[in-house]
């Protein structure tokens, strides 16, 4: 979460530099920072962060409304995104009327509606049951394969096993990393589990 806060320009690193594209985050002024986050970053949270008094449609469109995007363009972005995420029939409903998995899909749509350079996901499966978790992870796989960069913080081995690269952070440092390679999710799951067991018992090496 600390790493995500730094990447979101909510916190500043004690040393080093953070770049998004060619822009150094610490060089973005306080006046610009809110617009910078809205235009370049998408956020998905464990608890969805949807407004209960807004329909799913209004929740998803909120970042574009705040950016002053014309209504026609908002609708042009919303339709294919809602279709892809399987929530078109739910857009008029309110968050309290849909399931946790459907809320998270709406939250993902809100994060993607601005066409961000980077999607930040903080424990996105933490509040979901097994079925909804599987659905969200498949969704993330599809989004990633379409060219969207996703950085996910998770304590779930299952969620991590869907990634292309896993970083293990210990005491604030990158302690080890794994790349998926050509193996299956199950193969990668086992490699992640084995690495965690080594780290928990004091083994492993920095990489």
Predicted regions and their residues:
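Short coil-to-helix segment of the ABC ATPase nucleotide-binding domain corresponding to the Q-loop/switch region
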Residues: 54-62
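Catalytic Walker B motif of ABC-type/P-loop ATPase nucleotide-binding domains
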Residues: 119-122
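A short, proline-enriched helix->beta-strand linker immediately N-terminal to the Walker B motif
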Residues: 113-117
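Conserved ABC transporter NBD signature motif
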Residues: 16-24
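Helix-to-loop junction immediately C-terminal to a conserved catalytic motif
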Residues: 8
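Conserved ABC ATPase signature
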Residues: 94-98, 102-104
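Conserved beta-strand-loop-alpha-helix hinge in the C-terminal portion
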Residues: 173-197
């Amino acid at each position: 979460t600390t790493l995500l806060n730094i990447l979101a320009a909510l916190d500043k690193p004690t040393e080093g530099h953070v770049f998004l594209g060619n822009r150094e985050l610490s060089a973005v002024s306080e006046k610009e920072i809110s617009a910078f986050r809205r235009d370049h970053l998408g956020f998905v949270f464990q608890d969805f962060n949807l407004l209960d008094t807004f329909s799913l449609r209004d929740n998803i469109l909120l970042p574009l409304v705040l950016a002053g995007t014309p209504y026609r363009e908002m609708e042009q972005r919303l339709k294919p995104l809602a279709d892809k995420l399987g929530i078109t029939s739910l857009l008029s409903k309110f968050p309290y009327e849909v399931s946790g998995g459907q809320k998270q899909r709406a939250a993902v749509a809100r994060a993607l509606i601005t066409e961000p350079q980077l999607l930040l996901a903080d424990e996105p499966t933490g509040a979901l049951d097994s079925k909804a978790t599987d659905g969200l992870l498949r969704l993330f796989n599809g989004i990633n394969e379409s060219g969207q960069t996703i950085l996910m913080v998770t304590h779930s081995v299952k969620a991590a096993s869907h990634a292309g690269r896993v970083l293990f952070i210990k005491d604030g440092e990158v302690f080890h990393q794994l790349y998926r390679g050509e193996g299956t999710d199950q193969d990668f799951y086992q490699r992640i589990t084995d690495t965690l067991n080594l780290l928990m018992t004091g083994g492993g090496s920095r990489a």
